[in-house]
């Protein structure tokens, strides 16, 4: 699809859309949609994974202040388990775009596929490193989800959620095996599902 856009500059009424949290074993998948204001530039936008936590936090506040419109949305653990992670992510992206206070003329989606939207959309592979609005969306989503994981870490101590943010690190997998899944763990993900299968195996009767 020929978009006729200069990815290095802010385009009027173009929404960037990105997600954070497809890979973790627990918690919601969080998405964001952002329409930047060409008259109010934000310096230093980049893929959220390439920025320090302090820089992400500062940019998140600047994006909220300067963007023409922004919306953070989500799909909950129950939706992920019911729909699968791909469809839940598409649902959360749609919610983010539909939640914008300004209707975009085009939505650019990070990745290789688009959700079903009422506005024209196009996927952009590695868009968070190419399109400023997608980079802004990745920052909002990352900061929002990381903050949620700090809250969940306090609610479910022992899993190290504040450190690894729910991703399947060795520390998380060890804690999961030792403590068992919590209500925020995704039952449809193999490491969690396999643990539940082991727990549900009935013991052999003793003679």
UniProtKB/Swiss-Prot annotation:
Keywords assigned by UniProt, alphabetized: Cytoplasm, Endonuclease, Hydrolase, Manganese, Metal-binding, Nuclease
GO cellular component: cytoplasm; ribonuclease H2 complex
Cofactor note: Manganese or magnesium. Binds 1 divalent metal ion per monomer in the absence of substrate. May bind a second metal ion after substrate binding.
The keyword Manganese is annotated on this UniProt entry: yes
Source taxon at top rank: Bacteria
Gene Ontology MF terms in the entry: manganese ion binding; RNA binding; RNA-DNA hybrid ribonuclease activity
GO biological process: DNA replication, removal of RNA primer; mismatch repair
Intracellular or extracellular location(s): Cytoplasm
Coiled coil (UniProt feature): none
CDD domains: RNase_HII_bacteria_HII_like
Reaction(s) the record says it catalyses: Endonucleolytic cleavage to 5'-phosphomonoester
Needed cofactors: Mn(2+); Mg(2+)
Domain RNase H type-2: start-end pairs: 12-201
Pfam short name (any one): RNase_HII
Residues where a divalent metal cation binds: 18-19, 110
EC nos: 3.1.26.4
Family statement: Belongs to the RNase HII family.
HAMAP family the record matches: RNase_HII_B (MF_00052_B)
Record's function text: Endonuclease that specifically degrades the RNA of RNA-DNA hybrids.
Protein name, entry field: Ribonuclease HII
Organism: Azotobacter vinelandii (strain DJ / ATCC BAA-1303)
């Amino acid at each position: 699809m020929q978009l006729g856009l200069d990815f290095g500059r802010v385009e009027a009424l173009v929404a960037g859309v990105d997600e954070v949290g497809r890979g973790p074993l627990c918690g919601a998948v969080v998405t964001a949609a952002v329409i930047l204001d060409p008259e109010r530039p934000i310096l230093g936008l980049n893929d959220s994974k390439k920025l320090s936590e302090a820089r992400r936090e500062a940019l998140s506040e600047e994006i909220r202040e300067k963007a023409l419109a922004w919306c953070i949305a989500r799909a909950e653990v129950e939706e992920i388990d019911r729909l699968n992670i791909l469809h839940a992510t598409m649902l959360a992206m749609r919610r983010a775009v539909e939640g914008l206070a300004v209707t975009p003329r085009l939505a650019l989606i990070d990745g290789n596929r688009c959700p079903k939207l009422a506005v024209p959309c196009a996927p952009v592979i590695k868009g968070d490193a190419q399109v400023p609005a997608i980079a802004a969306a990745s920052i909002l989503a990352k900061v929002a989800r990381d903050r949620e994981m700090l809250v969940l870490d306090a609610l479910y101590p022992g899993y190290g959620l504040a450190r690894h943010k729910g991703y399947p690190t060795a520390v998380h997998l060890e804690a999961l095996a030792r403590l068992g899944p919590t209500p925020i763990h995704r039952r449809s993900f193999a490491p969690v599902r396999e643990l539940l299968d082991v727990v549900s195996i009935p013991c052999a009767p003793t003679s």
